[in-house]
Amino acid sequence: MGRFEGKVVSIVGAASNDNMGQVMARRFADEGAKVVVSGRNEDRLRALANEINGDWVHCDFSKKTSINAMIDTIVERHSRLDVAINSTGWGLLVPLPENSEEQLDQMIDLQFKGPFVWLQKLVQTMESTGGSIIQISSATANIMLDDHAAYMGTKAGTDHLIRCVANQYGPQGIRANSISPGLTATPMTAEPLKSAALLAEFESCYPLGRIGTSEDIAAAATFLASDECFMTGENLQVNGGLCLRRNPLGTELFDAMVAAGEIPAA
């Protein structure tokens, strides 16, 4: 019997092929959970749910009504919700002065307001049963990365929301934690990682000598969600030791790519 046998696990942000959400969904399903995947691409959600013998519910994580309806639907269909994971994100790369108000609004809606509403609904849903809440954050909530101000700021904000939930709702049996990956090989990072020079520059910042994988994050998530985990309010640094050092500067990445002949000098 898997350690999540009989448990219902909700994973938001599982509609992109082979992203963190999908890899986590497969890992939880392999360990016995009934996994409900959510996102905006219904065809991909349906295919994943069929693959893992799970369920799917459409959700636009920037809309309060959609988030609340998703959680209500899961409980209506499965009579419980034991684990809830948010892996949504938008890797916006824009210099601070060039960040438009529209981009900022979109980032806040997806990466701060959405998680806030999600947590509001979850504490109401889990207050009589307990449960585990996991937010996928980012090492950049604490470690600087050039031209990612809106992304980093909203991720840092959600880390604090998680601590608020953990502090106030622990007596109700609700545990809330976050995971901070560093640079991770996912569809979102596939294009920049085509640069061997860029990849090498990032890997030089990791004491373990490599960037992360979605499987690394899935392993951490199953631990945090398990009954063996006596942790709440924590931000788990799953980034190969990047948190001990720093990300490369934008100028360092540029110089490395120029030296490798991948891009022309300015």
Description of each model-found segment:
Residues 2-34:
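Canonical Rossmann dinucleotide-binding motif of NAD(H)/NADP(H)-dependent dehydrogenases/reductases
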Residues 95-96, 100-108, 148, 198, ...:
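Substrate-binding pocket helix/loop in short-chain dehydrogenase/reductase
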Residues 116, 210-238, 243:
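C-terminal substrate-recognition "lid" of short-chain dehydrogenase/reductases
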Residues 143, 232-266:
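Short C-terminal tail/terminal secondary-structure segment
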Residues 170, 175, 231-233:
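Short, small/polar-rich loop/turn modules that mediate ligand/substrate recognition or access, typified
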